[in-house]
Amino acid sequence: MIGEHKALVQRITNETKIQIAISLNGGHIELPESILDKNPTQENNIATQATTSQVIDIHTGVGFLDHMIHALAKHSGWSLIVECIGDLHIDDHHTTEDCGIALGEAFKQALGQVRGVKRFGCGFAPLDEALSRAVVDLSNRPYAVIDLGLKREKIGDLSCEMIPHFLESFIEAARLTVHIDCLRGFNDHHRSESAFKALAVAIREATAPNGTNDVPSTKGVLM
């Protein structure tokens, strides 16, 4: 995409406190002030990466969720900072759902008007034996169809039922139409990660410039 596509989002409820900085074109981003009491240990910096083209720093309090959001940001080409303080003493539901909602809102704000981009994107991503496909439409018509075929109860400290729910929450808040299918694979970690990477590839294609300044719709608007 051409131009600056950045957003800062805060979402505060009785269940979670979240803040997000995003740049869809990568590059430098920062939060005005961290809400976390972070100690620079290897464990809590597992989803942190900084290069000349991207800054990624994910801290949701749920390790496998951090890992998935990191993969999504990396392969979408985003710079992304996510901080969340959630009621994990209850379970992982509110944190996972609210992070998906907040990330979707941040993406929508950063994207702005759907103009001069391809609009549609398709991505395939393998991870060893697992293969996933994602198809994206920047339609402003939220609809999610997700089939990951997960078998385990949990991966790390994230309930497997919350993995598609995070994706649904993100997709609805971002106002996208997305179909994600894990086509094969027997390891649920691999199935999940390949799905997030496929989504990233599809988003990157959908948001790529199409060589015009037109709205890619016969309606003339996407709203």
Swiss-Prot record:
GO terms for biological process: L-histidine biosynthetic process. Pathway: Amino-acid biosynthesis; L-histidine biosynthesis; L-histidine from 5-phospho-alpha-D-ribose 1-diphosphate: step 6/9. PROSITE patterns: IGP_DEHYDRATASE_1 (PS00954), IGP_DEHYDRATASE_2 (PS00955). It catalyses: D-erythro-1-(imidazol-4-yl)glycerol 3-phosphate = 3-(imidazol-4-yl)-2-oxopropyl phosphate + H2O. CDD domains: IGPD. GO terms for molecular function: imidazoleglycerol-phosphate dehydratase activity. PANTHER family: IMIDAZOLEGLYCEROL-PHOSPHATE DEHYDRATASE (PTHR23133:SF2), IMIDAZOLEGLYCEROL-PHOSPHATE DEHYDRATASE HIS7 (PTHR23133). This is Imidazoleglycerol-phosphate dehydratase.
